[in-house]
């Protein structure tokens, strides 16, 4: 009988997704420590044994413990799972760097590119932490609420260290509800999770303008082609983009209104401005921040990404969505 790896794990980030992952891990029987940056909210979660803000009515398993002190949270486990918005990812790494020991291993489920540089988060981690620690990324089609409810979910995991990857797969995988696929392509897994948010904004805009299912499907398909082109230029494996971290995450985010990025796009397509849309959503819209970085990265790599470019024009250059539709439809004829 296969020996199942089990050890405590610390989750940094008590938003909806971080909390959902902590619930899933602890439900699997692993002692899990959840840290968040707001001590008052963490104290409330500890008392009420649930996240009333993000996941109301989903009680915490017994194995889930709330921790409000970062230094203490890092001593609880050698394995750290970071689940924070991409624009604060480097800040969190800088906070934990002096507190880490040689035994720590770092994984993240953050999806995005570094703000203002467009770098993959692995590059950010290597710059701040050096190459002392095994690194891993968890990415794929997962909505926090469904994960926390224990509904069937599948995801991809990639790591710089095969043993770390295998042990984390065993720990996260649950035959009843949560399936984890290993993928050796860290570049592709990270990129798919970042750029799909941008495409989801585009499909939301299209649906908000009433363009229908045909247009939505065209945007998803051509968006996948754009992600693949950019990925290949960065050394990714093309098969990654037809897997969980590519097509899987893209389809989920572009077609279901649980996606904040899609809802953000819907509001833009209905005539709301970006500030109004983000205020109504009330949580981080990763695609808004990553549109600029994706556009600049494509320019740097010399890769044609017309959908990403036009969403950038809407968000940062004041272009109207109806003009974007004309631009995309009026492009020169070409082969697929």
From Swiss-Prot:
Domain of life, per lineage: Bacteria
Protein name, UniProt field: Glycerol-3-phosphate dehydrogenase [NAD(P)+]
Keywords: Cytoplasm, Lipid biosynthesis, Lipid metabolism, NAD, NADP, Nucleotide-binding, Oxidoreductase, Phospholipid biosynthesis, Phospholipid metabolism
Taxonomic lineage: Bacteria, Pseudomonadati, Pseudomonadota, Gammaproteobacteria, Pasteurellales
Catalytic residues in the record: 196
Key word Zinc present: no
GO cellular component, one term: cytosol
Residues annotated for sn-glycerol 3-phosphate binding in this entry: 111, 140, 142, 196, 249, 259-261
Pathway: Membrane lipid metabolism; glycerophospholipid metabolism
Statement: the UniProt record of this protein carries the keyword Protein transport: no
Binding of NADPH, residues: 16-17, 37, 111, 144, 260, 284, 286
GO biological process, alphabetically ordered: carbohydrate metabolic process; glycerol-3-phosphate biosynthetic process; glycerol-3-phosphate catabolic process; glycerophospholipid biosynthetic process
Reaction(s) this enzyme catalyzes, per UniProt: sn-glycerol 3-phosphate + NAD(+) = dihydroxyacetone phosphate + NADH + H(+); sn-glycerol 3-phosphate + NADP(+) = dihydroxyacetone phosphate + NADPH + H(+)
InterPro entries membership: 6-PGluconate_DH-like_C_sf, 6PGD_dom2, G3P_DH_NAD-dep, G3P_DH_NAD-dep_C, G3P_DH_NAD-dep_N, NAD(P)-bd_dom_sf
Similarity-based family: Belongs to the NAD-dependent glycerol-3-phosphate dehydrogenase family.
Described purpose of this protein according to its UniProt entry: Catalyzes the reduction of the glycolytic intermediate dihydroxyacetone phosphate (DHAP) to sn-glycerol 3-phosphate (G3P), the key precursor for phospholipid synthesis.
Organism: Glaesserella parasuis serovar 5 (strain SH0165)
């Amino acid at each position: 009988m296969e020996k199942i790896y089990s050890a405590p794990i610390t989750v940094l980030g008590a938003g909806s997704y971080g909390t959902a992952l902590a619930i899933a891990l602890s439900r699997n029987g692993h002692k899990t420590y959840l840290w968040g940056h707001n001590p008052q909210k963490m104290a409330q979660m500890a008392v009420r044994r649930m996240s009333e803000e993000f996941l109301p009515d989903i009680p915490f398993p017994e194995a889930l413990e709330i921790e409000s002190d970062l230094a203490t949270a890092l001593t609880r486990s050698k394995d750290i799972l970071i689940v924070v918005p991409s624009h604060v990812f480097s800040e969190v790494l800088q906070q934990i760097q002096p507190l880490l020991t040689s035994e720590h291993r770092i994984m993240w489920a953050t999806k995005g590119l570094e703000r203002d540089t467009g770098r993959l988060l692995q590059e950010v981690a290597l710059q701040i932490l050096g190459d002392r620690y095994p690194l891993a990324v968890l990415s794929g089609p997962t909505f926090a609420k469904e994960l926390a409810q224990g509904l069937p979910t599948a995801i991809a995991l990639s790591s710089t260290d095969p043993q770390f990857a295998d042990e984390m797969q065993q720990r996260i995988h649950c035959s009843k509800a949560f399936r984890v696929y290993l993928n050796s392509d860290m570049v592709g897994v990270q990129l798919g999770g970042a750029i799909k948010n941008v495409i989801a904004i585009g499909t939301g805009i299209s649906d908000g303008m009433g363009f229908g299912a045909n247009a939505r499907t065209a945007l998803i398909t051509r968006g996948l082609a754009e992600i693949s082109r950019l990925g290949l230029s960065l050394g990714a494996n093309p098969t990654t983009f037809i897997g969980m971290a590519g097509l899987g995450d893209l389809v989920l985010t572009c077609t279901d209104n649980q996606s904040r990025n899609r809802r953000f796009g819907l509001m833009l397509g209905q005539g709301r401005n970006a500030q109004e849309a983000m205020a109504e959503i009330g949580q981080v819209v990763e695609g808004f921040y990553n549109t600029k970085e994706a556009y600049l990265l494509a320019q740097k790599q010399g890769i044609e990404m017309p959908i990403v470019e036009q969403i950038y024009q809407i968000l940062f250059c004041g272009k109207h969505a109806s003009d974007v539709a004309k631009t995309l439809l009026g492009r020169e004829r070409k082969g697929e």
